[in-house]
Amino acid sequence: MLFKELVSLYESLRSTSSRLEKTAMIAAFLQQAPVDELPVIVTFLTGRIFPEWDQRKIGIASQSMIKIISTITHNPEDAVVESYKKTGHLGVTAEEMFQKRRQVTFFEPEDITVKEVAETFYEIARSSGAGSSAKKQKILIGLLHRATTPKEAHYIVSLTIEYVLSGAKEGVMEDAIGQAFGATLDQVRRAHMLTSDLGETARIAKTEGAAGLEAITIRPMRPVRPMLAQNVSSIREALDTMGGVAEFEMKYDGARLQIHKVGKDVKLYSRRLEDLTDALPEIVGYVRESVKSDTAILDSECIAIDKDTGRPIPFQNILTRLRRIHKVEETQKQFPLILRPFDVLFNQGQSTIDLPLRERRKILEEIVIATDSVIQPARALVTDQEEKAQELFEESVKSGNEGLMGKDLNATYTPGVRGKKMVKIKSVLDTLDLAIVSAEWGHGRKAGWLTSFEVAALDEETGDYVILGRVASGFSDEQLIEMTEKLKPLITGEHGRIVDVRPEIIVEVKFEEIQKSPIYSSGYALRFPRLVRVRDDLSPEEVNSFTRVMNIYNVQQRYSISENGLRK
């Protein structure tokens, strides 16, 4: 397939805001796509180069892209920067610069194919070591030289930075795959969650139909998105949600880890499907020693502890471990870790996700052999009595944990799904995980830092982010400096002192209450919002929904707050 055909679809998708129209366009396109190119086409349509599970990276930053656009279009870098400030998108800037170039030196090479674009990206990703940055840029310049139109340049650049303005988000793509190949949305979504690969899901749907999708199962060394929990306001609500009886587990203030074991080979993945194996060597050792299964996938919580007291220490210390790929031994001594597996997704060659929790828990306790305190199954209690669950809740909080998880004993494990089969009860007032969508430059002593951050929830109906307020409290100077460096590459536009950013940085925010407000696009505002922590472990898809915001608002209208912070 020619790349210009895909470009034409991108442009058609940009021309409409209707989800139904987008779905129909994509479905028709996928039906005509060659089977061998379908995985790449689907992945490109979502704005990615590689599937979610794939660890490869292009590694070309925005500043390098500005230089590349300047080089290939013979426009000064300052002109490219000014265009970028105006357009807020490097793909659009590339198109604008190529249009100017076309008037002078533009030529017409042969049409490039989707396969050639993909293979060039794969070559860039393979480049590593000394001089790799220059080599990557040279390869990309060669690809851009083959662009036959400014639009093609636009989308090559957009794919390189994985920020395509097509609106073909995962939900739309799942709908389109089902519509194109006669499968239900549930079948497509389940297959997607089990493969972590929409392209592969589409290929199977086209070649094997609904039956092929149903046959897909989880497999070791291919991470899947974790099952997610909803918030509830009390233990009573948790019991009512679970039908009167539930398994309550301690809710640790740690990092979610998905552990894959095949023989002595162990891989550790974050909830964002990032490979953390090299950063956490002691966890690998714990698993090899204590998990008595030849092949297993475990869902777990990794907790940092005080080396003197053995008590849990704040979540941010775990992030120090997760980010560090050098001097691992040094941080290992500074922030020792313990592991609390709480679910099993695969055991001895068989998927366990369709078993009820009560059976999965039994398997977990059989295969995870407690080794002192460093690895043991998460502390759990099965009860129908609110008082007993409350005792465990209080013990959990006194131990330095966040509260409790409540789980339906009959529930299967549903990757990537947030539902009421698993809920969390926390000891503090409500917090929200929100995406930063804009920021403001500071002044005076903080000039050069981004110091105030507009945060937003996700409207699940439209796929858009709706703003809830601006957070400026709770940041140390070090955090502001770090946040500025994180956000700079994500800037998409500037308006005086305000910068718009791609919604990729997630923060946990606490607040006094939610109020109606005409100021923000959501129609609501957080009163006295304050940073709790940066959630590097969360992906943009895990931002709290606007439905969650409205649930909190409605609860706040009906109930008061008890002394321990739980809703009555």
From Swiss-Prot:
List the active site. Answer: 251
The EC number(s) attached to this protein equal: 6.5.1.1
Q: Show the InterPro entries listed in the entry.
A: ATP-dep_DNA_ligase (IPR050191), DNA_ligae_ATP-dep_bac/arc (IPR022865), DNA_ligase_ATP-dep (IPR000977), DNA_ligase_ATP-dep_C (IPR012309), DNA_ligase_ATP-dep_cent (IPR012310), DNA_ligase_ATP-dep_N (IPR012308), DNA_ligase_N_sf (IPR036599), NA-bd_OB-fold (IPR012340)
Q: Tell me the name of the encoding gene.
A: lig
* Entry's Gene Ontology BP terms: cell division; DNA biosynthetic process; DNA recombination; DNA repair; lagging strand elongation
Keywords, A to Z, come to: ATP-binding, Cell cycle, Cell division, DNA damage, DNA recombination, DNA repair, DNA replication, Ligase, Magnesium, Metal-binding, Nucleotide-binding
Q: Which PANTHER family match?
A: DNA LIGASE, DNA LIGASE 1/3 FAMILY MEMBER
The protein's required cofactors = Mg(2+)
Task: Report residues binding ATP.
Answer: 249, 256, 271, 301, 342, 418, 424
Can you tell me where the transmembrane regions are? Answer: none
Please give the function described in this protein's UniProt entry.
DNA ligase that seals nicks in double-stranded DNA during DNA replication, DNA recombination and DNA repair.
- Family matches, as Gene3D superfamilies: DNA ligase, ATP-dependent, N-terminal domain, DNA ligase/mRNA capping enzyme, Nucleic acid-binding proteins
Instruction: State what protein this is by name.
Output: DNA ligase
UniProt lists the family membership as follows:
Belongs to the ATP-dependent DNA ligase family.
Q: Specify the superkingdom.
A: Archaea
What reactions does this protein catalyze? ATP + (deoxyribonucleotide)n-3'-hydroxyl + 5'-phospho-(deoxyribonucleotide)m = (deoxyribonucleotide)n+m + AMP + diphosphate
Recorded hits in Pfam families, A to Z, give:
DNA_ligase_A_C, DNA_ligase_A_M, DNA_ligase_A_N
Gene Ontology molecular function, alphabetical: ATP binding; DNA binding; DNA ligase (ATP) activity; metal ion binding
| Family matches, as NCBIfam families | dnl1 (TIGR00574)
